[in-house]
Amino acid sequence: MAYTREQIRLRLDELASNMSLFYKRGCINYRGKTSDSKEYYSEVISEWLLEHLDLLNKIKPITRRSSYWVDGHDGIPDNPDSNREEELIAMAMKRQGSMPLVGQVLDYQTPLKSVQKDKAGKIDLLTYDGDTLRILELKEPDSKETMLRCVLEGYTYLKTVDKDKLISDFSRDSGVVIPEGTQLEACPFVFRGGFQWKEMQQDRTHLKRLMEVLNSKPYYVVEENGTYFVTED
């Protein structure tokens, strides 16, 4: 079913009451175009978000009682045949140790919840290059999720996490010293040639502007013979 531009905008107005879960809403993953203006849905949504940037400040922060560092995240899967491809890729990257442009892989599946009832996901990958700590929102090579979904999910985690405690916990427990005040960014981390990469080759003016405003710089993954490389284009 196709929707008009106005129908999408009205739906966004309805969803704005809970920005912590906004990225999960079905319309964020719509891949087609509006029935009237023939704009990509993600362009209409990105334009709306640019008009309502203040709403993103309503994403509720959570301070985790336990350490953000999880002992035992060694990159070795309990079930190598699991169908959770994204998680297996993240573990392989952890075992690799570091990657160009993003630095050392500190952790994967970093929890954000403090108590079970909290509505929060997990950080796919956390990396540090000596200057910048990055929340990387990883998508598997065949993922058909939109770049907009990827951007908003990562940004939601950025607003949810207690940055100071995250840095303190990892400095204390991981063995990697991260100075107080280190910059924290949230970035899409998707495969070059995949659906999200292809979106970025198109005329996505509002999406690209939204990414600039949110400082959501995309990085593209290339896998060669079991080794992961990272590019910016």
What are these regions (language model features)?
Residues M1-D233:
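Charged, terminal alpha-helix-loop-beta segments
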